Amino acid sequence: MTAQAGHEQQLIARVMLESPLPQLDRLFDYAVPAALREQARPGVRVKVPLRSAGRIARGYIVETTEAVEFSGTLSELDEVTSSVPVLTPEVWNLARRVSERAAGSASDVVRLAVPPRQVRVEKAWQLEQQSGEQPSRYSANPSVTGYGDRVIDSAIDAGRRLAVAAIPAVHEVSPGVWVGRWAVTLAEAAARTLASGRTAIVALPDYRDQQQVVQALSALVPLDLISQLDARQPNADRYRAFLRCLEDAPRVIVGNRSVVYAPAGRLGLIAVWDDADPLHTEPLSPYVSTRDVALIRQEQSGCALLFASHSRSTWLERLVELAYVTPVAPDPAVLPHVVPTADQPGAEAAAHARIPSTAWNTARRALEDGPVLVQVARPGYAPVLACQDCRTPARCRVCEGALRIGGARQTPACDLCGAIAADWHCRHCESTRIRLVTAGTARTAEELGRAFPGTRVIVSDGERPHLTVDAKPALVIATRGAEPVAAGGYRAILLLDGERMLARESLTVAEDCLRWWSNAIALAAPRAPAIIVGVGGALARALVTWSQQRFSAAELPDRRALRFPPMVRLATVTGRAETVEQAICALPDSVDGHESATIDVLGPVDAGDGLVRATIRFDYALGAEVARSLRSSIIRNSTGRTKRQTSKATGTKTSFRPPPVLRVRFDDTEILE
């Protein structure tokens, strides 16, 4: 390596490229020209040349060094596009670990962690930093209440991992502002961390949960110490909040699943609410859940980790069983008043009633005092239709999609292609009569509005979200997850369509329903009844005794015997038959030191479009080896030699055929639905 002018040693920048190509998932060495030497710091955005492609690529400097093994001439950095080190070493190490666990690319994880640059926002932030203005100081000494004598406080201070059972109640954090009691617990834990001079990250499923936590935090800590990172934010607001996270001052960072990648110089706590919510699973490559990222980051940083929920997931219960996570319950215990109609006298006679007399009478009495929540399975008017005579599901004649009715006196239409079924007839019995199998939020609201004339009816679902309702009498019809928080809590809760929810074919259907129902019941006022219709057995007992963790624990032996998650891990491999076969054959048979761990392959099965899908089940001890093997297969497939395509019109070879598809996804439980 030649020395620069002035006898300075050549500075080398190791750069991660922003590229979806798996073969580029490594660090590339570039020489730093003298003009860029002061700006080329680890974490900054750069532009670099790609010799093979003859173009300029974007990337980040991960590290700089003055020693390099390469003996040839290195290409030079083309440009440092920003002097702000947005990719911190901690986040880079996290991205590398996460991508290796899921056989993905580190650049895909960095894309989730670092929002797009906003030049004006960045320049304004830099001017603020130069002004020397300091954020507010937080000098309080808060404690997490409701869990005995500082149990959670000591765990946060010691950096332990907790599975916290949330308190089923609502709480007024400021005059007229009510939130779930769980939000207060997370806010108190974050404030406790902030008071110790460390940063807290709070990861939540969606914007409804974020609003509750921010409201609870606002009553405890200064607003300028709260940063929100959310994909729903305008790009400028999100980038501004991200830059705040780069500052040295500790703060509370609140957001959705990607917030677990937020930069934090002195990280003291990661808190995750409702880890089993599917919104915690990243839909983009490498498809890693908030729970897994939080566990990795806690291991790397040594911070405290707090999982909170009303109903513990089987994934978390497995970690409790292994004593890797410590369970914490409310002290004193809080027991909601849950009434299952399936266990009441005369339940068999009322089994066919969607709303039995017990539920009607409970709602009527409760409406004299305040709002009543009615949870239903589906939005819309009549989301499921069938033949009135033979009960065959009604299907679209164009695409075979399910038919639905969007409103009263509307014509059935396809839920997939939108085709109107004006002259529908049953293909099985030729009947033209349609039966409304289920009632969605709109039809339920219509029926209850007639049953309780003069009562306010509020519909809350994905299309018409309501985050809060006041304490005045009202019927609130909501789908699962869209229930508003009522001032003072609901005076009664009716959980309808329980049998229909449980009829969904899925490995996790029982624990999902338990989670949906538990979250709704937790919105009740003290001693208010929660009526669950048509559900009995172990699920009803878990709700009545408020012992959801026992149900989760009882699931694990069966999952272990059947080799289902979370007792084993899954990976799906999708591609053309020969490509999938090559990837499967390359898997290791065993790993030294873990000879008892096993790998088994299910399939391949047809995945449509000429592709097949194989499912790999493997023990946790084999996870790293399986990920490395599949990652190698992805790279080989991506870099394999391809044949030229010949133009039929001219007979000339015009382009290269792209490599065959090979997609790998770890911990994909959707295939079990």
Placement of each model-derived feature along the sequence:
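Accessory, non-ATPase domains that flank or precede helicase/AAA+ motor cores in DNA-metabolism machines
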Residues: 1-340, 347-349, 365-368, 390, ...
